[in-house]
Amino acid sequence: MKEIRSEIELHSSVSTAWKILTDFSTFHVWNPVITQIIGEACLGERLKISVRTKKGKTRIYRPTITKLEENHELRWKGKSFIPGFLNGERIFIFQQTSRDYVRLLHSELFSGFGTIIAGHRLIEDVESSLQQMNNAFKKRVEHET
């Protein structure tokens, strides 16, 4: 299993950050990586997610929301067409660090033998996309505050 982690401090309340993260209909406005999410922020919901790759191509994923704790944690998990090849779980956790600041812990967990094949390239691409998304999210959240 491989875990790729990132975090960012936001000058915002948890409720504002949560509202923006779970408003999937506006991802296309602010998110350079996840350009569309079709579905609702509900436990068990199967989403259709469009992701722009580093090379500018669009990939479609269909993960399911596996955890939803309001103002705290959102997770979705997807599987490849080939069982056991590559599974990914996107994790967003908010921590209130002070009255005016919140930390977003943003990570991706990968499992399956595809992680061996993709290896270093997978890690670099995902690290880059997490950072791009974090920076865009910070800009959006702090603009709303």
Predicted segment positions?
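Hydrophobic ligand-binding cavity/cleft-lining segments
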Residues: 1-42
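Short beta-strand micro-motifs in enzyme catalytic cores
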Residues: 2, 45-47, 90, 102
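Hydrophobic pocket/interface hotspot
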Residues: 16-21, 27, 47-49, 65, ...
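Juxtamembrane/interface motifs at transmembrane-helix termini
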Residues: 36-40, 49, 95-96, 123-126
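Hydrophobic-ligand binding "helix-grip"
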Residues: 38, 55-103, 109-114
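Short aromatic-glycine motifs in intrinsically disordered, low-complexity regions
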Residues: 50-54
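A conserved amphipathic terminal alpha-helix motif
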Residues: 103, 109-145
